[in-house]
Amino acid sequence: MMSSSSSEIDVVKTRIPTYDEDDNTVLYAYETKPEFVNKEPNIVSDVSCNTEEQQKTVNDVLIHCQVIYDAMQNLDKKIDVIRRKVSKIQRFYVKSLWTNRKRYGYKKYSYRLAKKLKLKKMKKNEVYESFSYPESYSPTLPVSRCENNSPSNFPRPSFCMEEYRRAEPEEDPILSRTPSPVHPSDFSEHNYQPYYASDGATYGSSSGTCRGNPRADGIHNTYSTDHASAAPPSVARSPFENDRYIEEGSITKHPSTWSVEAVVLFLKQTDPLALCPLIDLFRSHEIDGKALLLLTSDVLLKHLGVKLGTAVKLCYYIDRLKQGKCFEN
C-alpha cells in the first residue's frame, strides 16, 4: 500500500497478478520514481547548510553585541570616576571662595589704599632725605648731657636724626667761658640753689630762668664753677635738672651756632608757657641751632607730634629768629 503522505506523481503503480482465479483481489506494487530519489538528498543538504550559516551569523552578532556591551560598561565606570573628580574639584573651589572671600569693591579700595601708602612712603623718604645729615649741625663739638629720668610724653617721629658721638672731655665754647663773679645778694634775690650733675660738675639754676623777655640781661644764673665746687653735695637739686649753664650774652650769637642747650634756653626765654613742654622733645632729638632753623609746621605736626597752636607759635618765633628780630626790644 502507498502511504497517505506519498503522492501518486512521485511513485510508479504496478499491478501484481494473482495465482488464485477465484479471488477477486487485485494487488498493486508502488515504486518511487528515480528522479525523486536522486533529488531528495540534495534538498536536505542545502537546508542543513543554510541553518549552519545562519547559526554562525547569529553567534557572530551576539559576540559583537557582548563586546559593545562590555565597552559601554567600561565607559560608564570611567564617566563615574570623572564625575566624582569634577564634583570634588567644584567643592574645593567653592570652599576656597568662601574662606578667601574678599569684601565688596576690594580691588577698587585696595588700589586706593596702595596708592595712599605709596604717597605716604614718598613723603617720609623726602622728609628723611631733608633731615639726614652726615655730620652734626653745629660746628662745635656736642656737649655731653645728663640723661633725663622723666619719660617724654611726646611721640617720636618716623625719621631718626643721626646721634651725636660723644666727644672727648672738651666743653662747648659757649659753656666754657668763665663768668664774672656774682654778688651774694643775687642768690637771695633769685633763690639760687646749686646742684650736682652726674659727671661731677656743679650747675646752677634760678627760679627766674623762664621769662617772657628774650634778652640775655634777664639771665641771672651766673654762678662761677669755682664757687659751686665748694657747695656740699647734700644741697637740693634744681627743678631744671638737665639745664646746662650758659653764659650771659651767648644766646645772642647766630642761631646756626647754637648747641642743644642754647636752643632749650631760647625756648625758655621766648615763651615759657607754650614752648617749655617741648624741651624734652628737643633734647631727645638733639635739635640744635641749624635743626631749629630747618623746622617747619609740617614737620612739627606730622613727625614730632606738636599741637597746632604750639607749632604756629614756634614757627612764628623761628621766622623772627631768621630775620634777626627775636632779640629786639
UniProtKB/Swiss-Prot annotation:
SUPFAM superfamilies cross-referenced by the UniProt entry: SAM/Pointed domain
Residues bearing the modification Phosphoserine: S138, S238
Compartments reported by the entry: Nucleus
Pfam families (UniProt xref): SAM_1 (PF00536)
SAM domain boundaries: 258-325
Keyword terms of this UniProt record: Nucleus, Phosphoprotein, Repressor, Transcription, Transcription regulation
Function, in words: Putative Polycomb group (PcG) protein. PcG proteins act by forming multiprotein complexes, which are required to maintain the transcriptionally repressive state of homeotic genes throughout development. May be involved in spermatogenesis during sexual maturation.
Protein name as it appears in the record: Sex comb on midleg-like protein 1
Naturally occurring in which organism (per UniProt): Hoolock hoolock
